[in-house]
Amino acid sequence: MTQQCNCSEGSCGGTRYEELVLERMLYSARLKESVARRDSDVIVAMASMIADTFREGGKVLLCGNGGSAADAQHLAAEFTIRYRSSVHRPALPAIALSTDTSALTAGANDLGFDEVFVRLTEAYGCPGDILIGLSTSGNSASVLKALEFARKRGLKTLALLGGDGGAIKPHADLAVVVPHTGSADRIQECHIAVGHVIVELVEKMMGYD
């Protein structure tokens, strides 16, 4: 049920705000559609790589900063706990590198923040594992360095990026780049949508659907 505004006409900007809601949400939907149509094959390939890694006893590491750190943690939880209550399966090993406050602050203090995810990848990553880097700009130094290190260590690398992919894209075996610049919000919305689809695909590929 739609509630009517009781203020004098126009004083609360109701119609203007409703137009903003439509503009933002419809643009977000169009952006997701653009990514889906352009990169559906890449998304399927990412899911296949992750499923193969889990089957072989490997794990997934994820890293990002700010909202991307939250997205990394969100997706790790979907793997380790569950995605949908209708699917019953074992836990799948995924670790968000942005969740340990002591490790993050010690690394930032002793090594510099750009080296934090490198150090954690060194601690937890093994050849054959996967590191997923999330960066709305495609240029986050800490994520870039972690992906560079991961490749040298023998990990596979995936990335969810924005803009033109930035400096990180060449260091990812597979990357989904959201074609948006100027703000992180719409990119993050696409990243979490892509991540959810990947988790669902992994479950299906592993026979848990």
Curated annotation (Swiss-Prot):
Residues engaged in binding substrate: 65-67, 78, 109-110, 135-137, 140, 188
PROSITE patterns, alphabetized: SIS
Binding, Zn(2+): 74, 78, 188, 196
UniProt keyword annotation of Zinc present: yes
EC number, as in UniProt: 5.3.1.28
Annotated keywords: Carbohydrate metabolism, Cytoplasm, Isomerase, Metal-binding, Zinc
Comment on bound cofactor: Binds 1 zinc ion per subunit.
Record pathway: Carbohydrate biosynthesis; D-glycero-D-manno-heptose 7-phosphate biosynthesis; D-glycero-alpha-D-manno-heptose 7-phosphate and D-glycero-beta-D-manno-heptose 7-phosphate from sedoheptulose 7-phosphate: step 1/1
Cofactor(s) annotated in UniProt: Zn(2+)
InterPro entries: GmhA/DiaA, Phosphoheptose_Isoase, SIS_dom, SIS_dom_sf, SIS_GmhA/DiaA_subfam
SIS domain boundaries: 50-209
GO BP terms, alphabetized: carbohydrate metabolic process; D-glycero-D-manno-heptose 7-phosphate biosynthetic process
Main subcellular localisation: cytoplasm
Signal sequence, renumbered to the chain: none
GO CC entries: cytoplasm
Family: Belongs to the SIS family. GmhA subfamily.
Record's miscellaneous remark: The reaction produces a racemic mixture of D-glycero-alpha-D-manno-heptose 7-phosphate and D-glycero-beta-D-manno-heptose 7-phosphate.
Annotated protein name in UniProt: Phosphoheptose isomerase
Gene designation per UniProt: gmhA
